[in-house]
Amino acid sequence: MATTTTILRTDEAWNGEKLPDYLIGKPEIVINKALIPPKTNLPWHHHDLMSYAYVIRGEFYIVLKNEAKEKHFKAGDVLCETVGSIHRGENRSDAECELVVFYPSKKDMPLSVPHPECEESK
């Protein structure tokens, strides 16, 4: 017998921020597989759209730039990303982390906006 289990149903990002209204415009769904090598920090960035991820294997942290806030995620976890907050992912472990990231976007919208000016102050 087939079953369905809801693994995430929320109106908040992982840090408790309320999600914005959906974007207006021609829809485009993007699904990416992300591989984060061991001991790797991703660049600082933010998203202007909602995104969701499922951790297939490994573990990582999401760290907010302007707040002393971070959260740990591991294989089997799901998360709803922040919108508009500068953050980065950090794989502090000795193993690769694999995620599938879902972006309900609109045509030609960037999935993330880099903040290279933040790299100096890490």
Language-model region placement:
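Substrate-binding/catalytic groove segments of enzymes
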Residues: I62-L64, H87, M109-V113
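Glycine- and acidic-residue-biased ligand/ion/polar-headgroup-sensing regions
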Residues: H47-E67, D77
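Ligand-binding loop in jelly-roll beta-barrel domains
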Residues: K69, V83-M109
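Short coil/loop residues immediately preceding or within conserved phosphate-binding loops
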Residues: I31, M50, G84
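A short, N-terminal "cap"/entry segment at the start of jelly-roll beta-barrel domains
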Residues: M1-K33, H72, L79, H115-K122
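A short beta-loop-beta micro-motif enriched in histidine and acidic residues
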Residues: I24-P27, K39-Y52
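Short acidic-glycine-tyrosine-enriched beta hairpin
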Residues: I36, N66-G84
